[in-house]
Amino acid sequence: MLISLFCCSFFTNTTYALTPVEITNNSKAQLDEGLNPRGAVVTTTNGQILYKYHKDKKVDPASTTKLMTMLVIYDDINHSKVSLKDKVKISERYQKMSQLPNLTTFPLKKGQTYTIEQLLKQAPLNSSNAATLVLAEHIDGDISKFTDRMNREAQLLGMNQTHFTNPSGANNKIIKPYEPKKYKDETSSYTTANDMAILTNHLLRKYPNILKMTQLETDTQYNQQLHNTNLSLPHQSLGMKNVDGLKTGTSKEGYNLALTAKKDQLRVNTNLFNIQPYPSEKAKFARHKVANALTQNAFKNYTYRKVISKGAHQIDGKTYNVKEDLYDVVPKDNSKYELKISEKNQLSVKYNRQFTKGEHIPSVKVEPKFNFLSVLFQITLAIVGIILVSVIVIIAIKVYIKKYSKN
């Protein structure tokens, strides 16, 4: 059977014209159009773009930079360079880092000892800038070297419009004199919503356990509480069911949020940046309302499911042996889609969609299936045809001979 699909769901080209605020207001919120982010992208973890809004516009990542910092550190843990249980003793220098004005942080005191895991928790919870600087210096001995590694990783991932100037995401002018010396003449990092989507997708695929940290709403260290700045977590003031991360960010350029949520096997990552004005409580809360609305509509319109099972199937009038189950993201409101088989015998679902750089449509191997009865039927038809032609020829010859023998 030939299955066909047309895509006219929420996140198609026609609805790309809707701004994030318009989409949010469709969910009964009332936000001013001026609260639109500078850039936004909604993706699945395999890089399928469900919604885009100025996805390649340059933005200030602010503290969402810490997601790259965490990725680099988790890579180090994965390669046994460091361990989550390794201890870091707080020096006077580290204490002073945590006392810088105009920075979100968690107070560190000389003589205290923290594990790398505890310092990592400070990054998504209190958005501690000091914790990321301490970790970078502890691991590489030099914050510049750590920042270099962040930028190399960005290039390897295809984040070609991204540049980091330190591990915290703060403006280098604010963290003086602890800014990376190599980057002291630079100020803020820059990226795009699309590049940060690449980062969050990669981070969650490679290290899904990081969600155990990003979904924490509170933690206690040295009798002091840390509070997660992500107000979209389920029990927070703007909480939404199924949210389990990731990171907020704030700078003079506005308010950012990298949000992730999972429902019925579909994980959706929403990245939005630079909602203005700053400072503004309205804009601060708007980042959560907008991200929540974009995420909810992704769940409303899309699902992740088994499209076709392993085994024999009729596709486009032919029988194929599908080598394994094919799972994919498909629109909920469409009962028709098209299964296409490539010249290399790869089966995939085709509809109007895009992916981030380096990602592709899921596919499975198929093989044409030999059908004995069908082949026998074709052979029988051929034989019958030959016999009929032969009979006609014989009759024609006999008629011809009879006609001309009388002459």
Predicted regions mapped to residue ranges:
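Active-site-adjacent loops and short helices of periplasmic peptidoglycan-processing enzymes
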Residues: A17-A193, L204
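Domain-terminus/edge residues, biased toward the C-terminal soluble/receptor-binding domains
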Residues: K176-P177, Y183-A382, I392, A396-N407
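Generic signature of intrinsically disordered, low-complexity, basic-rich segments
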Residues: F11-N13, M150, R287
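Generic low-polarity alpha-helical segments
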Residues: L5-A17, K85, N345-Y351
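Intrinsic-disorder/low-complexity regions
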Residues: T12-T15, T24, K406
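Sec-dependent N-terminal signal peptides of Gram-positive bacterial secreted proteins and lipoproteins
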Residues: M1-Y16, I379-V399
